[in-house]
Amino acid sequence: IVLRFDDTDTRVKPPLLEAYRWIEEDFEWLSGRRADIVIRASERMPIYLKQAKKMIEGGHGYVCRCEAEKFRKFREGKSDCPCRERETAESLEDWGKMNSGEIVEGGAVVRVKTSMGLPNPALRDWPALRIQHSPHPIVGEKYKVWPLLDFQSAVEDQKQGVTHIIRGKDLMDSTRKQTLLYEHFGWAYPETLYWGRVKVHEFGGFSTSGMSSSIEEGDFDGWDDPRLPTLRALRKRGFEAQSLIS
């Protein structure tokens, strides 16, 4: 069994250092065994950066220097961003500057080249990597360019030989984005199954980000607060792991 942490967002949803241990403990409690392999994406950054450079070199991606609002207008108008038409060498030069710190945070992103005329706006030259200078709890300030989840998890799935993906219906666009990325690299995309939004009668709808905000605002005492639907909270309330599995 592989336990994987997709932890490459250092600013918007920065990982909690203690959460790595909590999740491993929760996994062992629920499954009755430790994970055979624990993968932290933050410790595999060279793989993602190498694949990103390969994508640019192959003409399947480019470095975009447009401001977010400016690119949004290009996307809405189904028109190509000027950066898209630059020579590969120019994008590679900017790629080097992104990694060296010469380009500031927000000054550039790497985009996957799809088509700006696609019906679904989310798929039009979607962002794959961006600059983030916030320190990471495990690797600190070692990297300046970090992959977004759709790129990182897609590459990791292929490297790990994943054949089936089970994800929420709200991530259908992730499947569509990653399928386009796999086509660029000549990879076969895994079979994907979906579930609906999870609701527990007592708690209604919930999300990790929503619970995190509520904890920060003092509405809950922590991730093991008995009022939350987390494994740590259920365990604290006296639930047996087998009752959740059954």
Map each language-model feature to its residues.
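Histidine-anchored nucleotide/phosphate-binding helix
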Residues: I1-L3
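Short, glycine/proline-biased beta-turn/loop segments that scaffold the active-site neighborhood
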Residues: F5-E18
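Active-site cores that bind ATP or allylic diphosphates and position pyrophosphate for catalysis
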Residues: D7-T10, A35, R40, K54-M211, ...
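Secondary-structure capping and boundary motifs in well-ordered enzyme cores
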Residues: P15, A19, R44-I47, K144, ...
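A glycine-rich helix N-cap at a beta->alpha junction
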Residues: A19-R44, Q51-K54, G58-G61
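Predominant activation on well-ordered alpha-helical scaffold segments within soluble catalytic domains
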Residues: E24, T175-T179, Q242-I245
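Scaffold signal of the M16-like zinc-metallopeptidase fold and its non-catalytic homologs
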Residues: M211-G222, R227
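Extended, domain-scale alpha-helical bundle/helix-rich regions
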Residues: D224-S246
